[in-house]
Amino acid sequence: MAPLAEVGGFLGGLEGLGQQVGSHFLLPPAGERPPLLGERRSAAERSARGGPGAAQLAHLHGILRRRQLYCRTGFHLQILPDGSVQGTRQDHSLFGILEFISVAVGLVSIRGVDSGLYLGMNDKGELYGSEKLTSECIFREQFEENWYNTYSSNIYKHGDTGRRYFVALNKDGTPRDGARSKRHQKFTHFLPRPVDPERVPELYKDLLMYT
């Protein structure tokens, strides 16, 4: 399969995540990691805050859009370091802590905090973890009437019907073929669940500046 252009080219004139547009933050140039909101504080400010007390950990709930993505089939989606994607029943699995980055209105990228890989979907509807943020890693986030969300590829859809490829997990936690998945199926319904920093403090060390 021919390589796809990185999102820097895909999004054209979008400048940087540091530039706010409404409630969304735009992506930086291709190859650069989007800065976290916590990184906007100066080093002096971070140092003055001292060690990670309970109040600081609680404050992080609102700093990052870090979530667990719970599927109606009973699994949390996780992105493993080897690039594979699968479901786990474990609450607060390190590989199941995901960072949601708003690209534009209704468009998001999803990054595994521990693995550092972006969720991607190829033209066959297969899920994988990508080291680079490409156009295959941009998804349409749709809020459904049953209070769940669906995530569909922004570039891949069926030519005859226009139906998009959906992120989905089977009943055994394995990734489901996105080309065969439909919006009304429970395989495609996900609920973003909050992350408790006290359950996974190692994923917040870079923000709290402690070891």
UniProtKB/Swiss-Prot annotation:
The GO annotation for biological process reads: cell-cell signaling; fibroblast growth factor receptor signaling pathway; inner ear auditory receptor cell differentiation; negative regulation of neuron apoptotic process; neurogenesis; positive regulation of cell population proliferation; positive regulation of dopaminergic neuron differentiation; positive regulation of ERK1 and ERK2 cascade
In terms of Pfam families, this protein maps to: FGF (PF00167)
Disordered: annotated segments: 31-53
Output one GO MF annotation. Answer: fibroblast growth factor receptor binding
Where does this one sit in the cell? Secreted
Q: What is the annotated quaternary arrangement, including any partners?
A: Homodimer. Interacts with FGFR2 and FGFR4. Affinity between fibroblast growth factors (FGFs) and their receptors is increased by heparan sulfate glycosaminoglycans that function as coreceptors.
Output this protein's name: Fibroblast growth factor 20
The gene for this chain is: FGF20
